[in-house]
């Protein structure tokens, strides 16, 4: 994959793990004058030719927020190719939209969903989203959002050995309780909520580590300097092979994101390292990965006082920290690529059985 400039990170990004190896692939030319993840940012008419020429047994489409996806839908429907739709929209965020927008969206999605053969949902809120728009239960198959559990878990021994080394490099003593944030420092992620909650903590052993870059970094650093908040570390963007060191050196993981955080794969990653996790009630993975009071806590979006209380609760009890971490590790085992494949295979079986009736 080629390096690219990420506006939200505010820097050029080149992932240090291969993303295109191990499978056949073909990239279609994008004719959009302004390529992006927006609707008009993906215009790949070549998808029509590919579907017509190959007439696949099944077409797997991720979302409906681009012209290319709609070209794929229409072509597949016209040529009798079954479509499996994979989306990520959580219902709790959907219901925050105004009634007029929801009504218009229902007019668009109802006929589209009626033509789709099967649906893959990533978690509980996403399943509820599909049901809200009238998708019958029999067409829904769980294909949870997952990360490379095996690679991350396999990296644990080596990073654990370097846990003390990384802490020493950052000036963190062995008794320090490290609270970790991983992600872009942007409005959607709400890192300031975490910084304010951290400031309120009374434990003198508290440490906060921000992994990532973004437009809010300057404001966060200014807040730390002006209010003399102790033991806050900004380590910048860390690539995929470096991240395990930071998860291994941490004690608690927090993702305080707001609307737009449809899942939060960094939570999966943190749980692979047996970390207790705290997320806001708008983080899409919350109801699937965070079992409140068992492996972490879910706080009301923007409620800094509640977040502070949950952090205090964990930091005051070392045994709870450890038991929550063990529970996180157990839970994330059910969110793996194997489960993704099982969901797709179940959808295929459903389509084949339906076609043979």
Model-derived segments and their meaning:
Residues 82-86, 90-115:
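Nucleotide-sugar donor phosphate/pyrophosphate-binding loop at the beta->alpha transition
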Residues 173-189, 195-198, 209:
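Conserved donor-binding/catalytic core segment of Leloir-type glycosyltransferases
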Residues 218-238:
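Nucleotide-activated donor-binding/catalytic signature segment of Leloir-type glycosyltransferases, i.e.
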Residues 237-238, 245-250:
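Short alpha-helical donor nucleotide-sugar binding micro-motif in glycosyltransferases
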Residues 276-280, 290:
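Short hydrophobic beta-strand element within catalytic cores of glycosyltransferases
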